[in-house]
Amino acid sequence: MIVKAYAKINLALKVKGKTKDGYHELDMVMLPLELHDSIDISLLPDIYDTYVTCDDFSLETGEYNLCSIAVRKMKEKFNINKSFRIHIHKNIPIGAGLGGGSANAAAVIRAIKDLLKLKISAEDELDVAKSIGADVPFCLFNTPSRSEGIGEKLTPIEVNKEYYVLLIKPKRGLSTKEVYVKYDEVGSSSNPDVDELIKALKEGKTEEIPNYFGNDLEKASITLLPEIQNVKDELKAHGFEIVLMSGSGSSVFALSENKHMIEKESKNLEKKGYNVFITKILK
């Protein structure tokens, strides 16, 4: 069985505080992208253990890979005694803040449910997703959403325009953990207004998005990797008004209704040596 694992971007990421457990509480606007990995998953004979492979050898495929963790969580939750062969065909860049690992885990949850014809509720699936990571619940349902808390509270939102996305991934990625550690040191210079941003998306007022979007982790990520600021400046110099780092970085995106502009400027940026992806928002 082959399932798609869709990337995401954050049009808003606001850090609201910390839980007693030390997790950062967030308020985010998350949008799924057409850009996706493909997950090839099949049942193995009982004598074998689950194993994960990937066509990108830089990806950790051992027990700490989120696909491996998803299998273990599904087996524990639903008393499954099967093993699986999982191969990841990677299109989503690693360490980019695009939710690739979370998307892979969510795809494995869906695939195991379908392969074994499990009669489980959406709530049960969500419980497994929450136990794996903050972005996995969003990736499981894969619809434009407001995500609150540590990612467990999802509210669907309306996006009433077609949006195209130009992504640039710097050569170096960033780990989410190191970014949050740095955030605790340097704070944020961003102030996204999630309520007003959601309203602008619903009403199709693209021109208002720059007034309300933002990412509280940008300052921390740029401190760790100044190239992120260079990429943002480059995209703005090419005429884009909605330019933001996604998640904890290191990827930066430009959002536009103008598909021709996205395609034209992507070619110009590729000529300058940037690692460029073109995709669009899924609704």
What are these regions (language model features)?
Residues 32, 130-131, 137-140, 156-161, ...:
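Solvent-exposed alpha-helices and their adjacent loops that cap or buttress functional pockets
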Residues 50, 141, 145-242, 257-270, ...:
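Conserved, helical-rich catalytic subdomain that frames metal- and/or nucleotide-binding sites
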Residues 1-96, 114, 118-123, 148-150, ...:
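ATP-binding N-lobe of GHMP and related small-molecule kinases
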Residues 105, 109-146:
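Contiguous, small/hydrophobic- and glycine-enriched helical/loop subdomains that border
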Residues 11, 39-41, 67, 101, ...:
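Residue-level signal for inorganic ion chemistry
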Residues 87-116, 134, 241-256:
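Glycine/serine-rich anion-binding loops at beta->alpha junctions
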Residues 76, 111-118, 188, 260-262:
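A glycine- and small-aliphatic-rich helix-loop capping segment at beta-alpha/alpha-beta transitions
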Residues 13, 37-41, 135-139, 145-146, ...:
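Short beta-strand scaffold segments in enzyme catalytic cores
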